Amino acid sequence: MEDFLGNIDPKTLEELYQSWKINPHSVDEGWQKFFMGFDFALSDTFGQGSTLSDLEFKVIKLIEAYRLRGHLFTKTNPVRARREYKPTLDIENFGLEQKHLKLKFKAGELIGLSNATLSDIIERLNRIYCSSIGVEYMYLREPKLINWIQERVEPTLNHTEFTAKEKKHILYHLIAAVGFEQFIHKKFIGQKRFSLEGLEALIPALDATIEHGAEQGAREFVIGMAHRGRLNVITNIMQKPFNEIFAEFIGESYDDESTLGDVKYHLGYSNTVETDYGKKVRLHLVPNPSHLETVGPVAEGIARARIDDEHSGDVKSLIPIVIHGDAAVAAQGVVYETIQMSRLKGYSTGGTIHIVLNNQVGFTTNYTDARSSTYSTDVAKVTLSPVFHVNADDPEALLHVIRLAVDFRQTFHRDVFIDLLGYRKYGHNEGDEPRFTQPLLYELISKHPNVRDIYTKYLIESKFISSIEAKQMQEQYNDLLEKHFAKAKENPKIKIKHFLPEKWNAYRYSQSSDFEESPQTGVSADIIENVAKLITDIPEGIPLFKKLIKIIDERKKNYNDGKVDWAMAELLAYGTLIYEGHNVRLSGQDSERGTFSHRHSAYSIQGTEEKYYPLQLIPNAKFSVYNSLLSEYGVLGFEYGYSVALPEGLTIWEAQFGDFHNVAQVIIDQYLSSAEDKWGLQSGLVLLLPHGFEGQGPEHSSARIERFLTLAARNNMQIVNATTPANFFHALRRQLKRDFRTPLVVFTPKSILRHPKNVSLVKELENGSFQEVIDDNKVNESAVSRVVFCSGKIYYDLLQRKEELDVDDIALVRIEQLYPFPKSQVDRVLDRYPNTKKWLWIQEEPKNMGAWNFVKEFFDDVPIEVISREASGSPAVGLSKIHSLEQAEIITKVFRPCTCELKNKYCGLQCEEGSKRFERKKQFEYLDNK
């Protein structure tokens, strides 16, 4: 016999009973109910005298087994028998026999039966735990959560008795769900739509979530889902006009000719709808790519921004809903990252309702090959979230679970999962043949009626509706679709509407001319002074770490001397924006302090776990900084979503090292760089990516500048490699000083954060704007023979050598913004040096990386050459000594004196001897070849 409660024996149970007699509240609520009204000491029914009957205890174990494992024996699969699990719930596995079925047991009190027979107890347990609903919850650890669920599923037999009106309402949504799919299948034969057929019960489920959620205080819902069933949701739930969907099937062009667009089942939508009880709620279906589960963190970020902004932190006002596929939720790592965020202060949205569309197959992969876990939803156990498994052919059971899920979320502000078991009527898409890979399953599916017909039959047989009325409902819905279809044919042009228009209607799309010159972003001296004081004045009575005090004092001294370093300029940018009424949010691994211990936006108070945030003292807006969980993909997706929902705020994600951003490459590729082209969706998100070659090896050197430049087109992002604190200050402020939003990627410094020359004057923050190009102001223009273009940290290496040699005829020109490339400003630089003989692009990255392959196209009027590291598959060497040799060779090539008959001041390898030198043919030799 399986010992389901191996840590509990009759003696322990007796001790619990004795404790309860002394103090009823000394045991949890479940045991209180069991012992209440019992007097086991007087019971000799089974000859046990003053101890609990052994048989009684066995029945208790049976009850606990149903609670713990009943979900394994449910009738939740609509098309085939489920897997068998051992041991079963047969009474023989608990030391009980058939002869005990007619005996009465007081243990029935645990599930609401007084002095019931074992047969009655088992019948009740099967109805509660082994019907169309399976409940996983006994792992939740917190008694209040377990008791809450038991109190709602056991007395009700895990069932809701719906009224005739409610049943018709369910039927209407099933008619809509099934009718929509069948209509499209008939009108647009063979076109991909990723139908919902086999899981149409999702539509009444979402309707119930919104209706019941609104009654429980929700005024807004953010929905993230992939393509399966999306068109059905966007019409029947989001109430996007049918004719607009049909136009997306028919149409051949967009009303805005500059739009690149996306397939119809990726587009987002926002709308205000009215519930059956007259409450207006706001719905948002987040646009998404085909990359499964990426939309999860994006939806959570949007939800958090709306909660912070629109709902003043009230999580009950907004409910996020994330809809998964069974194969994806079980296998995609970003799901784990997102779920781990759910209870963290910087990322919590007060609980998400997760609905898994479980069609038991992933493209062509059987569920037995798609996961090692029992359920696709087993990731829910990570955050101790309950899971309800439901048969998709039982819509009333599903709506019962939906109400439970909404109530649980609104009560405990935690995630809850619904595993909706159905099937996929067709292949992965409508042109796919599933019988190649699942012949037995699709033989069953081909004979299986849809949920609309199943439920209609039940209502007719139960006298809730007549067959004529049911037929009329279907005909009316189909007539509605026909009218919209005719309307779509009249005007088939496709219009992509703004997602979250209430936030974005005030913004326009950018034009190329917007990037020719940056707007003024200076701040008055008084405001800067006030913010600087907050940052550098430590309130009395707050004990801080001595080294931190030294850093703050150094900042104060520099500021009083009229100078700011990189970190101070950054904090001043945030503080001045907050002063002007803009929220600022920064998150990333170690972002409070900064990876390189430079930022210190939060001061840890000695002897406590508390922190002091100077910028949070500015009253006009909110400053939030969070050390993120060790995630790039999930967190960047979250911050992207946050930026989309709060364009008037500054949202920043910082990588620990820029090298690690590629863990989140999907978010960069599918959202950050392309969302405006695909969905008309702007974002002002800032990425801070520490970058620079300093001998730390191939994984701590490169933020992959070249990758971002490859993605750059149509003004879809700004790529900055700033070299001064002031320019960084203006780049950050520029994000909020224009009437459009474009992502900003900043390659931030590491070793030069404390470089004595990497400082700016406070006056540079008070006036001016971001400088896309910084020319050399310490040269004799007419005497310049060599112009060196560079970007980022290598400038300081070049500057050091230039000053050591006291050179005034080599100009060092910094390209501070790589994209949009400042062509007109660069041309003005070229015109400034008429006597130049050599034009160089210098970079510390390998030739096939960095900016060279991008920028060289813009120097079409001059014969520019590159000096860099040799092309390589790996960004950097592993040994510090070799790194130093490489770096020295790059710098040396710029300033090497000429020794040939040409008598140039600097060697350009232009003479006959130079052209034959080994180094000319293999320019990347790190040591001199003489």
For the regions a protein language model found, what residue spans apply to each?
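Subset of Sec-pathway N-terminal targeting signals
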Residues: M1-F38
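Alpha-helix capping and helix-loop boundary segments enriched in small/acidic/polar residues
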Residues: F4-N7, S50, R193-E200, R282-E293, ...
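Extended, charge-enriched "interface" segments that sit outside catalytic cores
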Residues: F34, F38-L202, A218
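Flexible, glycine-rich loop/tail regions that form catalytic "lids" or insertion modules at the edges
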Residues: D54-E64, L68-K106, K144-L145, T156, ...
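Active-site cores of enzymes that catalyze phosphoryl transfer or operate on phosphate-rich substrates
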Residues: N158-F180, G251-E300, R304-H311, P614, ...
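Active-site pocket-lining segments that scaffold enzyme catalytic pockets across diverse folds
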Residues: G179, F183-N243, D553-K556, D565-N583
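Cofactor-binding active-site loop characterized by glycine-rich and histidine/acidic residues
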Residues: R219-L384, F388, F596-G649
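Conserved phosphate-handling catalytic cores of large alpha/beta enzymes
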Residues: G362-S373, K381-F417, G422-G427, R435
